[in-house]
């Protein structure tokens, strides 16, 4: 389990959350129903900020390639993403198709 309280990358999660959501909505990749389902899933996850960990980890990976964030931030958000995925799958809230969609 990653230590959510000490994770240095969680500050960037808050900054990226709205930008990533808007980008996906503008590209037509996510409709209102998917946004609502993901929000309900993440509401049940004990994180210190309300975010989209899977999308954010992908966003961080792109930023790392551009030299904007360090590898520790990316690694921490990958741990956060894995924790979210495992908890959501274990609770039966997210099927393989939804998980695959959130990775894109």
Curated annotation (Swiss-Prot):
Post-translational modification: Glycosylated.
Swiss-Prot/TrEMBL keywords: Antimicrobial, Chitin-binding, Fungicide, Glycoprotein
Translocase keyword on record: no
Any one cellular-component term (Gene Ontology): protein-containing complex
InterPro entries: Bifun_inhib/LTP/seed_sf (IPR036312)
One of the protein's GO biological processes: defense response to fungus
MF (Gene Ontology): chitin binding; identical protein binding
Oligomeric form and interacting partners: Oligomer in an unreduced state.
Annotated function: Chitin-binding protein. Has antifungal activity against C.krusei, C.albicans, C.tropicalis and C.parapsilosis. Inhibits C.albicans by increasing cell membrane permeability and production of reactive oxygen species. Has no hemagglutinating activity.
UniProt-recorded name of the protein: Chitin-binding protein 2
